């Protein structure tokens, strides 16, 4: 059974606290947009699609409570203002992830349309928002499954070496159920390959400095019993050079894809794309349409978030000196020289020229004969 990282029903939202994974599987209840903001900022939830869904549902949960307590304004305009301010606040929690601003923009439009309805009320406006947020949750899961199917088919038809009939795939960061509403994008492709018995083996990078690969992707792969091996980030080149291993494709997710295909994703993605090009390995980006930003023309226009130095100079994990029956004890350990300067960008930009295909819920987009992506075609009816 695929891991469920976001639980939502009847206006009640709970998420797995990813800061405690893989050691403790604990759900945290999110009641308000403020709690949602902190969960995103503190990376208790991460992954561009999941961030957008949690932000929307956090506000939906807050509105549900206000309605139940009769504390919501009956005035449609006042409720619209309340929702809009909360959405802008939520977007500030993770500016690089385009899914968050995209979802907020769509929800603002729905709210604005609701206000225009004859005899609109605050309750009606809030209800329109809640229904739209819940619909986003369901659509994200369905989109992820389509991404998985299209990606698995493309790899089987275009990436397999002549020596193997099943695919070996390397992935980076975490792009599974923990990063989306469910199933995953890049990890969803691996899941789809596994479900059709066309996966030979999966490899995942540890993804320094926050270790999303070792903490989260490895956790999901073990949970789903998918044959997989963890490597450190610096081992990727050696892995691709081993002919007997035969990595067929590298599949990653995205936090923002510019109109020309340039992709912002977890730091280290760019390096993997360069390695893939040198070794003749297919490099694929798996992303829903909500991650594609046609307004941003190239990666040069994407704002790169910088994270605290402590994420590089410390590491957090469990103590191994306790007995199996004892409660899990988490500790933070310093691993760098005190006083050293730190540069910690959360993302890098992979040029579209290094990407072989962008997997979406509408299919896999490849470059034309001039080496250009035409992502705008995806949005035409």
Curated annotation (Swiss-Prot):
Q: Any keyword rRNA processing?
A: no
Gene3D superfamilies according to UniProt: translation initiation factor eif-2b, domain 1, Translation initiation factor eif-2b, domain 2
Pfam families recorded? IF-2B
Instruction: Write the gene name.
Output: mri1
One GO biological-process annotation of the entry reads: L-methionine salvage from methylthioadenosine
Q: So what EC number does this one have?
A: 5.3.1.23
Tell me the classification of the organism that encodes this protein. Answer: Eukaryota, Fungi, Dikarya, Ascomycota, Pezizomycotina
Q: Which family does it belong to?
A: Belongs to the eIF-2B alpha/beta/delta subunits family. MtnA subfamily.
Pathway info? Amino-acid biosynthesis; L-methionine biosynthesis via salvage pathway; L-methionine from S-methyl-5-thio-alpha-D-ribose 1-phosphate: step 1/6
Q: Which source organism?
A: Aspergillus oryzae (strain ATCC 42149 / RIB 40)
Question: Site: Transition state stabilizer. Where?
Answer: 173
Q: Which GO terms describe its cellular component?
A: cytoplasm; nucleus
What keywords does the record list, in alphabetical order?
Amino-acid biosynthesis, Cytoplasm, Isomerase, Methionine biosynthesis, Nucleus
The cellular location(s) given in this protein's UniProt record come to: Cytoplasm; Nucleus
Q: What does this protein do?
A: Catalyzes the interconversion of methylthioribose-1-phosphate (MTR-1-P) into methylthioribulose-1-phosphate (MTRu-1-P).
The name under which this protein is listed is: Methylthioribose-1-phosphate isomerase
């Amino acid at each position: 059974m695929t891991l469920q990282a976001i639980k939502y029903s009847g206006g009640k939202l709970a998420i797995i606290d990813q800061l405690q994974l893989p050691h403790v599987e604990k759900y945290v209840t999110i009641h308000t947009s403020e709690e949602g903001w902190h969960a995103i900022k503190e990376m208790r939830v991460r992954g561009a699609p999941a961030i957008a869904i949690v932000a929307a549902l956090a506000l939906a949960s807050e509105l549900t409570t206000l309605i139940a307590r009769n504390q919501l304004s009956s005035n449609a305009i006042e409720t619209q203002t309340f929702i809009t301010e909360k959405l802008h606040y939520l977007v500030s929690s993770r500016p690089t992830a385009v899914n968050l601003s995209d979802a907020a923009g769509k929800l603002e439009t729905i709210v604005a349309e609701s206000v225009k309805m004859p005899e609109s009320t605050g309750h009606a406006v809030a209800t329109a928002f809640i229904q739209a947020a819940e619909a986003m949750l369901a659509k994200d899961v369905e989109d992820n499954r389509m991404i998985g199917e299209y990606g698995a088919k493309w790899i089987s038809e275009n990436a397999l070496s002549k020596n193997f009939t099943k695919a070996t795939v390397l992935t980076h960061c975490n792009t599974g159920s923990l990063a989306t509403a469910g199933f995953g994008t890049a990890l969803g492709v691996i899941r789809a390959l596994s479900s059709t018995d066309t996966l030979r083996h999966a490899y995942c990078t540890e993804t320094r400095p926050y270790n999303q690969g070792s903490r989260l992707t490895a956790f999901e792969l073990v949970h789903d019993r998918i044959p997989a091996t963890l490597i450190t980030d610096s081992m990727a080149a050696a892995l691709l050079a081993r002919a007997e291993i035969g990595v067929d494709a590298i599949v990653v997710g995205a936090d923002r894809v510019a109109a020309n295909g340039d992709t912002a994703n977890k730091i280290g993605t760019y390096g993997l794309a360069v390695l893939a090009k040198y070794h003749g390995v297919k490099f694929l980006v798996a992303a829903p349409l909500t991650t594609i930003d046609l307004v941003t023309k190239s990666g040069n226009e994407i704002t790169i978030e910088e994270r605290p130095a402590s994420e590089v100079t410390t590491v957090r994990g469990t103590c191994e000196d306790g007995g199996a029956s004892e409660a899990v004890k988490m500790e933070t350990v310093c691993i760098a020289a005190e006083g050293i300067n730190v540069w910690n960008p959360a993302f890098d930009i992979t040029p579209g020229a290094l990407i072989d295909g962008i997997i979406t819920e509408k299919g896999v987009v490849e470059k034309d004969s001039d080496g250009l992506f035409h992502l705008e075609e995806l949005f035409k009816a």
